[in-house]
């Protein structure tokens, strides 16, 4: 049904927005947490523990459960979905970036510190350039995952195509379910191609 297919476009675009904004917010949150969780950049053992705790807590809770929690906080809608994606993704992105920070060339950092550079300058000149490829690659890969995860967040009221899919299933409108699933499948395949192409360029 071409008419119904057009109605699916709006929720599908909302799903992409949820995944994209959630991933963008993840980068903002995960980057400082990764520096706390990396042994060679954290301030002390307490801040290292806090950083690691945040990363583990984020990964321990499923995206749908985060969705339920944020629907309770913000009410049904895409805002809950964005925060659910963000809180789930912080652990994934932060862990990989923290590991990359721990594996940087310490000689570069020591050389910059020897010039009397501030901590912020060491971070900006000595550490960030070494981990940027990991940040770019991991962010794009996580965005690809988030496209899929945001497709089901509507089942708990957190916005996107999942709300429409849930309603169609509940009312046994199987033709509409088929149209939605085909649309979701197409977006997932497209995001996979985009993710793979970007990661190839980075590496």
Predicted regions and their residues:
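Periplasmic/extracellular loop-to-transmembrane helix junction in inner-membrane transport proteins
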Residues: 1-22
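Generic hydrophobic transmembrane alpha-helix motif, especially the helices
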Residues: 55-86
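Transmembrane alpha-helices
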Residues: 119-153, 175-187, 191, 195
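Membrane-embedded alpha-helices of multi-pass transport/permease systems
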Residues: 28-33, 65, 80-83, 87-109, ...
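Glycine-rich helix-loop "coupling/hinge" segments at transmembrane-helix boundaries
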Residues: 72, 147-184, 203
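Cytoplasmic-entry segments and transmembrane alpha-helices of multi-pass inner-membrane transporters
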Residues: 33-67, 96-99
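Short helix-to-coil transition segments within interhelical loops
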Residues: 104-121, 125-131, 158
């Amino acid at each position: 049904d071409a008419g119904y297919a057009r109605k699916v476009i709006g929720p599908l675009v909302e799903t992409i927005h949820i995944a994209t904004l959630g991933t963008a917010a993840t980068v903002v949150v995960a980057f400082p947490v990764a520096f706390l969780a990396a042994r060679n950049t954290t301030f002390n053992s307490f801040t290292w523990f806090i950083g690691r705790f945040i990363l583990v807590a984020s990964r321990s809770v499923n995206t749908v459960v985060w969705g339920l929690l944020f629907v309770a906080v913000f009410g049904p809608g895409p805002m809950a979905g964005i925060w659910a994606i963000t809180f789930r993704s912080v652990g994934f992105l932060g862990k990989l970036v923290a590991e990359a920070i721990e594996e940087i060339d310490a000689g570069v950092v020591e050389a910059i510190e020897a010039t009397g550079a501030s901590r912020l300058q060491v971070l900006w000149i000595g550490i960030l350039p070494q981990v940027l490829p990991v940040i770019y690659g991991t962010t794009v890969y996580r965005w690809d995952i988030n496209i899929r995860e945001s497709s089901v967040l509507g089942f708990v009221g957190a916005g996107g195509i999942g709300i429409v899919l849930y309603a169609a299933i509940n009312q046994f409108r199987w033709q509409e379910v088929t149209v939605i699933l085909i649309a979701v499948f197409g977006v997932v395949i497209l995001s996979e191609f985009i993710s793979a192409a970007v990661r190839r360029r980075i590496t």
